[in-house]
């Protein structure tokens, strides 16, 4: 198994194996592994944003990536709430689990798709979704552009 496959499979799994793995590594290795993860997440984000733009081109607003969408966290009891927001350091003496089922298949497919995609032939700059309501500089630029539109008409 390739190291990136190993990392991504642990990262996408719904357990704390990824954190246990990182805790057992030295700082340089951990940062290198996190950089590998962010490169794949940037690729996924690029795909999502392009897909959202295609939907918006046909008039459908995809709320999950739209600026007006606000995500609510649903929990039924305080155990779920505690699990969601628990920031207790991870114990490193536990075993790391690796899901070799559908999640592993997804990771392999993601890696192959990234390698063979036309998007991968060009250098992918880190993609970040900017919400103008939370980014003051971008919001100010948009305000200037809007005010110039009004003044020019």
Curated annotation (Swiss-Prot):
Homodimer. Part of a complex composed of the kinase OPG054, OPG092, OPG114, OPG115, OPG142 and OPG157. Interacts with OPG175. Belongs to the orthopoxvirus OPG100 family. Keywords: Host cytoplasm, Late protein, Virion. Induction: Expressed in the late phase of the viral replicative cycle. Late protein which is a part of a large complex required for early virion morphogenesis. This complex participates in the formation of virosomes and the incorporation of virosomal contents into nascent immature virions. Plays a role in DNA packaging during immature virions (IV) formation. This is Virion assembly protein OPG100. It holds the Pfam family Pox_J1. Its main location: virion. It is found in: Virion; Host cytoplasm. One of its GO terms (cellular component) is virion component. The keyword Iron-sulfur does not apply.
């Amino acid at each position: 198994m390739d190291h990136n496959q190993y990392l991504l499979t642990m990262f996408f799994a719904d357990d704390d194996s990824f954190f246990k793995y990182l805790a057992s590594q030295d700082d340089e290795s951990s940062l290198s592994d996190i950089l590998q993860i962010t490169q794949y997440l940037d690729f996924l984000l690029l795909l999502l944003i392009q897909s959202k733009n295609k939907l918006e081109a046909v008039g459908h607003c995809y709320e999950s990536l739209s600026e007006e969408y606000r995500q609510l966290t649903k929990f039924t009891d305080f155990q779920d709430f505690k699990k969601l927001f628990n920031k207790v350091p991870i114990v490193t003496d536990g075993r790391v689990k690796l899901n070799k089922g559908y999640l592993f298949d997804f990771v392999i497919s993601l890696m192959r798709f990234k390698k063979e995609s036309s998007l991968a032939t060009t250098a992918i700059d880190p993609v970040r979704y900017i919400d103008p309501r939370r980014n003051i500089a971008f919001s100010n630029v948009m305000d200037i552009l809007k005010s110039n539109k009004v003044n020019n008409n």
